[in-house]
Amino acid sequence: MKRLLDYLNKYSLDDEILAPQAKGLLGDAKVELGDPGAGIKYYLEAADMADNSFHTPIYLMKAGMLHETEGNYAEALSLYERIQDKYAESNEGRSIDKYIARVKLQID
């Protein structure tokens, strides 16, 4: 896993498809290594790198689910609502209502 992190940290692309995927992989690696905070950071960076209906909702969803796991329900709700508002037609957007309902129950 350490070698993967070293490689991905050196990886630099301007490509709007591969660059977010590399950043998302860094997030995956950090989560696997037990650092969900760093995972969230990388997922949000990946989501913001390419504003499209394929990559962005995937990484917003991953960050939202980690926030939810960490008990940060307001942050999770914000990300889920962003998916609902901007990416409703994505795979994640089509099932986002149940995630929103779940975190709202935790907040109330």
Each model region followed by its residue ranges:
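Short solvent-exposed coil/turn linkers within tandem alpha-helical repeat scaffolds
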Residues: 10-20, 47-56, 84-96
